[in-house]
Each structure stands twice: as structure tokens, then as C-alpha cells.
Amino acid sequence: MDDIIQLIHRHFEDDDLAQQRPVEFIRCVWCRFESISRTEWRDAGVQGLKPELLAVMPMVNYCGEIIARYHGVRYSVYRTYRRIDTDEIELYLSREVGV
């Protein structure tokens, strides 16, 4: 693991006017980045997604977050895959508007 990514958990809380406001909890975790395969690129493209990053990290560092930030850019976690032979999980990231 040679890089750091921010995983963002978002939930909503009521303010004084009973309006729901988003609250984000950010954690920094170690990971490494790998290339996205041609198969993943094709399959994601069929669904209208454009995969940009593949982050690999220990399974214990991931708690179901659906938003990540790397070098100031926010990404959506559109798919995860648990590697069977190790204790690692793959996060497939796509940049989306409004994340």
C-alpha cells in the first residue's frame, strides 16, 4: 500500500428547521492503485459508466462507503470485489457529477 485515499460516509441529520442536511465523515486509508481491465471498461461502458480508478485496500479498511476522494477529486464507488486469495477488496471508482 503506497497511496492514501479518502473514504467518505454520508448521512443526513435534521437541522433546527427540520430540514435534512448532509453530514460527511471522512477517513483516510492506505491503498494502491491498479489498472482497470478491458473487460471492466467494456462492462461499465454498457451501463453508462466511465471507470477511472481501481483502488485496492485491506478489507478491514472498507466500511461500505460509496464516495471517495483522491487528489481533491470526488469519485463514486460503483462496484466492489473481494479478492478470494487475499484479505483485500477492490473499489472501482467513476467520476460523477454531483458526488
Regions inferred by a protein language model and the residue ranges of each:
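Short, conserved turn/kink motifs that form compact alpha/beta structural patches or helix kinks used as
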Residues: 20-99
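Extended boundary segments
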Residues: 1-32
